[in-house]
A protein has these predicted regions:
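Flexible acidic/His/Gly-enriched loops in nucleotide-sugar-dependent glycosyltransferase catalytic domains
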Residues: 63-82, 104-166, 215, 234, ...
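Short aromatic/hydrophobic "clamp" motif used to bind/position activated sugar donors
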Residues: 90
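Conserved nucleotide-sugar donor-binding catalytic segment
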Residues: 122, 140-217
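Acidic donor-binding/catalytic loop of UDP-sugar-dependent glycosyltransferases
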Residues: 46, 97-110
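The conserved acidic donor/metal-binding loop of glycosyltransferases
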Residues: 94-98, 123
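A conserved acidic beta->alpha catalytic loop
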Residues: 40-49, 65, 94
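Short, acidic, metal-binding catalytic loop of nucleotide-sugar glycosyltransferases
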Residues: 24-33
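N-proximal low-complexity "stem/linker" segments adjacent to membrane-targeting elements
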Residues: 1-25
C-alpha cells in the first residue's frame, strides 16, 4: 500500500501562524512514501525559519513574486513545485490549511478503486473564528458555466491531468483567477474524469489575508474577476473545440463592469 510515491505540493506566502501545522499534518500522515515539496513565495514574515526546521524532511523551493496579482504568484509557485515533483499522484495544500492523518491513504485508495479518474475533490471543513463548519456545495442553476469550486487544498490528481492543464495553457492568462477555479473548471467541464467526495479529510482555514478575502461581493474587483472568468471559460471551450454561446450572465457582467469603469473614471 505504501510503495507508490505520492507528492504533496505546498504553496506558502506569509503564513507563519499556520505553516508549521500545515507541514506537520503532512509528516503525520499514515502513508509513508511521501514527497513533500514546499514553495515559499518570498515571505516577509518568519515562514522560512519555521520551514527550515523541517529541511531534512521537505524539498524547499524559494521563489520570487513576479506578479502584482496574488493568484498568479500562487499559480507560478505551484507550477514550480510540480516541475520538481516525481509522484504520479499529487495532492495540493495551501500553507494555511492542513490535512487530517488519513487523507493521503484515503485518496490513494479512491484512485485505486476508480482507475478512470484523473481528479478527486474532497469537500473540506472550514475553520473560521475557532469554529468548524462543512463547506456547502451550492446548487448550480447553469451547470454549463460555473463549476462546483472546491478549494485548492481539496484537490488531488494524477500527474497526467496537470500535464494536460499545462499543454492547454490553462494558466497563462487572466492573472486575477485563482488556481482552484481553473482546475475545477478544466476537470469538471472539459475532461470530466473526476469525483467529488464528502469525507472529512481537509481543513480549509478562512483567514483575513487570504487571496479571496479582499474581494467583496459585487465590488469592482468582484465584477472584474467574474468577467475574466467568463473570458477564460470561452477561451478553454474554444481551444477544445466545444461550441458555447455567451449568455445573459456574461452580458450582465460585461455591462456592469463597463459602467463601473465609467463611474470610476
Amino acid at each position: 500500500m505504501n510503495k507508490e510515491k505520492i507528492s504533496i505540493l505546498i504553496t506558502n506566502f506569509n503564513k507563519e501562524k499556520f505553516i508549521e501545522e500545515c507541514i506537520l499534518s503532512c509528516l503525520n500522515q499514515n502513508y509513508n512514501n511521501l514527497e513533500i515539496i514546499i514553495v515559499d513565495n518570498s515571505s516577509t514574515d518568519r515562514s522560512m525559519s519555521i520551514i527550515k526546521k523541517y529541511s531534512n524532511k521537505l524539498f524547499i523551493v524559494k521563489k520570487k513574486r513576479d506578479s502584482l496579482w496574488s493568484p498568479k504568484n500562487q499559480i507560478d509557485s505551484l507550477i514550480e513545485a510540480f516541475k520538481k515533483s516525481t509522484g504520479n499522484l499529487i495532492l495540493l495544500l495551501d500553507g494555511d490549511d492542513y490535512f487530517l492523518p488519513n487523507k493521503v491513504s484515503h485518496i490513494k485508495n479512491i484512485f485505486l478503486k476508480n482507475n478512470n479518474l484523473d481528479v478527486v475533490f474532497d469537500v473540506p471543513s472550514i475553520l473560521a473564528n475557532n469554529k468548524f463548519t462543512r463547506l456547502k456545495i451550492k446548487k448550480k442553476y447553469n451547470k454549463n458555466i460555473w463549476p462546483t469550486t472546491i478549494p485548492t487544498s481539496g484537490i488531488s490528481f494524477k500527474r497526467v491531468f496537470f500535464e494536460n492543464c499545462l499543454e492547454f495553457d490553462l494558466f497563462d492568462s487572466y492573472p486575477t483567477l485563482e488556481i482552484d477555479f481553473r482546475l475545477n473548471f478544466f476537470a469538471q467541464r472539459i475532461q470530466r474524469k473526476f469525483l467529488i467526495i464528502k469525507e472529512n479529510l481537509t481543513i480549509y482555514r478562512k483567514v483575513n489575508d487570504g487571496i479571496m478575502s479582499n474581494v467583496n461581493f459585487f465590488s469592482y474587483n468582484w465584477w472584474k474577476k467574474r468577467l475574466q472568468a467568463h473570458y477564460f471559460i470561452f477561451d478553454i471551450y474554444k481551444e477544445n473545440e466545444i461550441e458555447y454561446k455567451k449568455n445573459y450572465d456574461f452580458y450582465l457582467t460585461k455591462i456592469t463592469f463597463w459602467l463601473l469603469n465609467k463611474i470610476i473614471k
